[in-house]
Amino acid sequence: MNYTTQMDAAKKGIITKEMQVVAEKEGINIETLMNLMAEGKIVIPANKNHKSISAEGVGQGLKTKINVNLGISKDCANIELELEKVKKAIDMNAESIMDLSNYGKTYDFRKRLVEVSTAMIGTVPMYDVVGFYDKELKDITVDEFFDVVEKHAKDGVDFVTIHAGLNRETIETFRRNKRLTNIVSRGGSLLFAWMELNNRENPFYEYFDRLLDICEKYDLTLSLGDACRPGSIADATDAVQIKELITLGELTKRAWERNVQVIIEGPGHMAMNEIEANVLLEKKLCHGAPFYVLGPIVTDIAPGYDHITSAIGGAMAASYGADFLCYVTPAEHLRLPNLEDVREGIVATKIAAHAADIAKGISGARDIDNKMSDARKRLDWDEMFSLAIDSEKAIRYRKESTPEHKDSCTMCGKMCSIRNMNKILEGKDINLLRED
């Protein structure tokens, strides 16, 4: 190959096979795609060692993508169940899967995930350091942090979340500005603890070029994590969050100089009226890099329903320009999600992403809605089911409450507006009280 990374290829005017796949999926001119990749406004996460991937693009002018989180924990270490979730995510056309395993030797699951997943794969290496070395957090060395990142890269993951923006300056801002929920990022809180226990700078910030060496070697996309994302609507858009975002913008430019692709991670918990400003801030401060939002969750009072609170925030964020939505399941804040939670989270997030694509004017986004509306006008139930984002549920609901007349449902029966308009416009009687 005459290039090191997808970004390097784009800058050199080299069309990669991954670019060809993305251009075809998106219906975008490949030269336009390549130019936006060269500017860092679109990324194609595709590790050189992930052979089963069907490449996806994330960024400006492309369809909004969704990510599914899964992985083993100490309390739920069933690898086979997590692989069932992987299959469910792929079957439901999720573009990304993040393995957030944080217990034991995570290699076995990660290896199998890379073998079977056509979706791009992300990880948070910070979760793995304690289990990998079987050492307490405070005893982990700088070399060991980077060795784990390289291990994940070598295994074939396409992007890694690294909380490089949590430096000593950001921590000082955190200390000066009281928060209701402190630091809620799991990786961020672990890094904060390591820095405090060792009185050291964040190694991923201090030795950022070493991180870029790994990313360049494997064409590993860098997802710059927001350690200080708000964990409550009270903490949204505060000085700590913005301080870290400014740092992430500076690191983005350094990564681009090395042809390393970058995604910026964002909030978090946030009231609806703050979402548009946050998307604008990310795009300005991080120079148009793709924005990956974790929700946003728009109210803090809905445990058990946070797939809904996040779908509201995600639809808004993506409509304003966010590019990548992390799903949230009904189990958020309560437990590890089961298979049904995963399904519900995917459906809610896909609805949010699609609704945003319509609002953004993504080419062809409305086509399936128009097909659905036409099928409804014709009362073609089979076609409606085939077009539904969750066909299984639509079919089940229809079967659970069967109408007397096939050209209606049990909500309206013969008073169905579509049925009656069709008949009247065809010059027929609607016969509400007697048989047709």
Swiss-Prot record:
Q: Where does Zn(2+) bind?
A: H269, H333
The positions annotated for binding substrate are N69, M98, Y127, H163, S185, R186, G187, D226, A227, C228, R229, E265, Y292
- One of the GO BP terms on file: thiamine diphosphate biosynthetic process
The free-text cofactor remark is: Binds 1 [4Fe-4S] cluster per subunit. The cluster is coordinated with 3 cysteines and an exchangeable S-adenosyl-L-methionine.
Q: What is its EC number?
A: 4.1.99.17
Cite the annotated pathway.
Cofactor biosynthesis; thiamine diphosphate biosynthesis
Q: Which InterPro entries match?
A: ThiC, ThiC/Bza_core_dom, ThiC/BzaA/B
Stored Gene3D superfamilies: 6.10.250.620, Radical SAM ThiC family, central domain (3.20.20.540)
Recite the UniProt keywords alphabetically.
Answer: 4Fe-4S, Iron, Iron-sulfur, Lyase, Metal-binding, S-adenosyl-L-methionine, Thiamine biosynthesis, Zinc
- Name one matching Pfam family: ThiC_Rad_SAM
A GO molecular-function descriptor: carbon-carbon lyase activity
- Positions of [4Fe-4S] cluster binding: C409, C412, C416
Q: Which cofactor does it need?
A: [4Fe-4S] cluster
Reaction(s) catalysed by this chain, per the record, are: 5-amino-1-(5-phospho-beta-D-ribosyl)imidazole + S-adenosyl-L-methionine = 4-amino-2-methyl-5-(phosphooxymethyl)pyrimidine + CO + 5'-deoxyadenosine + formate + L-methionine + 3 H(+)
| CC annotations in GO | cytosol
Functional note: Catalyzes the synthesis of the hydroxymethylpyrimidine phosphate (HMP-P) moiety of thiamine from aminoimidazole ribotide (AIR) in a radical S-adenosyl-L-methionine (SAM)-dependent reaction.
The record's section on HAMAP family has:
ThiC
Q: What family is it from?
A: Belongs to the ThiC family.
> NCBIfam families from the xrefs?
PRK13352.1, thiC
Protein known as = Phosphomethylpyrimidine synthase
Q: Which organism is it from?
A: Clostridium perfringens (strain SM101 / Type A)
Give the organism's phylogenetic lineage: Bacteria, Bacillati, Bacillota, Clostridia, Eubacteriales
Q: Which gene encodes it?
A: thiC
